[in-house]
Amino acid sequence: VNTRHNIGFKILDYIANQEGISFQTVKLGEVAELKIKGRTILLLKPNTYMNLSGKAVKYWLEKENIEKENMLVITDDLNLSFGTIRIKTKGSDGGHNGLKNIQLLLNSTEYPRFRFGISDAFKKGQQVNYVLGEWDTEEKEKLKERLEISSKIIKSFALAGLNNTMNEFNGK
């Protein structure tokens, strides 16, 4: 679980720990409810294979009657240096199979995503090992600060909206 590919889970676990809430095992994943300023934020960690996470995303959007514009998908991104954050309104899957599956099942590329840079500091042919590998010492030292910013992003998205969140946090 402590791998670069699981940064989304790590961010959600950080928020849950910070807020004193816990995840419950439910259909297709684990869910925690964060109540903040009169709003309820549903945190979802799909338990499908990452490359099939669209199944859980689609199920929970439909079950909770959430518009795709009101969800924020967190994804690792090899094309961004470690810890770099990009929040986007829409886009391609960027070669990420989890996003590819979400887009297939939602029949759309138009949903907000939060891209967390994990860098591409691996040797040729070592991408899978790198992505599924644990954080190195230097990354671990910087991770807590990046998790704190990530937590603020999730809360800002829910309370201030996508555009305000993008303006405040993109590039930080």
Regions found by a protein language model. Give the residues of each.
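Short glycine/threonine-rich catalytic loop with a Thr-x-Gly-x-Asp
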Residues: 92
